[in-house]
Amino acid sequence: MSFASLLLAATVSVNFNSNIGKFRPELHSSSYGPTIAGCTQKTIDEIKEMGFKSARTHDWALANSNQRVCDYHHIFPIIHLDATNPSNYVFAATDYLLKRAREDVGTDIFFRLGVSIEHSGPKVHFNSLIPDDFDKVAEIFAGTVRHYNHGWANGHKWGIKYWEIWNEPDNDNTMWCLKDGDLGVGSTPEEKAKDKARRDKLRMELFCKFYVTCLKRLKSEFPDIKVGGPALCFMREDYFRALLKACKEAQVAPDFISWHQYTNHPQAIINSIEKGRSLCDEYGFKDCELIINEWHYLGPRGWGGVWSSDPEILAKTWEGPGSHNGIDSSCFNLTVLSKFQTSKLDQAFYYGCFYTGAWGYKNSFGNKYKIYHGLKMFSSIVHSLSTICESKGEGTVTVIAGKSKNGRSRGILVTDYMGTDKEIVVKIDGVEDGRQCWVIAHDNERDFEPIYVPFNDGKLVLKKTTEGSAAFTIWF
């Protein structure tokens, strides 16, 4: 390797002689699951290849149109009926989906209690309206847990551990809506902003009351499950403070808090974890788990790019290396997944809904997006290795490495997220010189492609096909 090429190379290191922790598959989960219609064995196999530990049920009602699944208004469709009477519930379709997820895909279930997102505009709401009777909804939630964990209403004894109260109550006009809308009204921008702030405060106060009501009800009957939420849109400190304060005053402890993160900055996600831990500890909930249960790459155009109607903006959002599901997105995922393993996070769920389209893993022709190959690549690491070994990245390059349970296999994942270096030098301790290695490359031109890379003098050199994002797995 010449001096000139060294100037265009990042240098990272791995020490297989130094163990620093254990791999945690629970940090590699998703919302992807089976569907009632159009879910072939091929689709099941594709989901399995991505290797998710658990499946979160949020938005499954959207992916299963015309079916009564998961959402509480589907499970208990006539709200004025008696919630303690098992004959008033409709569980069959949800039973079928969860059974397929558990048995066919092999995932654990993370059950979101509440409703799927409702993009019906600022004034028209149906399922996402704030419930009139919090106690009634809490009783419906209890009936749901009882059905799946205790066999009630011709149910099951599946021992589903995690139950989440609602989703994104802080999201305007989609999830926790006032009857006359969440946007402010008034004759001037100032009046509208003031009224909007009033509505937001009211919505937050109502949700804190609802959250505590449901938490108390579920923990009183089911002390063995973990209950929490509420899957905020992001690590929103003011909202979490209000929620944790309400729990403390009610003397009920959430088992976990959850939030979402859509960004193109990996460190922003890691920073949100540190903030979550700090907040829970501050309010005395030191055993409260931290869960990010929606996360996804969001390109430089943000949500404006995703929802734009401008053909030029849409083309940049959905096509090329920097697109929503392109190689930058995939290497962002691999960077984040690697960092999760040594963070204070307890669980993480990559957001996917439907199999094709914006939030899928393939296009309408069945061609896999780059993110599919990246998620499959991480699965090969987290499910093959047991012990995390010491490693050090550099700049845009992130490294995670480890050994199998019996110590015979060693693996390394090297991810360069939007870097400009043409080569990556990997220095390795703990592997005898000259030992054969197997390398898989993932970049804008290659999808999970085996390449030959010699290992000599305690190092190997990974060559990128071009500047930008790329990832490699190395196996000894």
Each model region followed by its residue ranges:
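Carbohydrate-binding surface patches
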Residues: 394-433, 437-444, 469-472
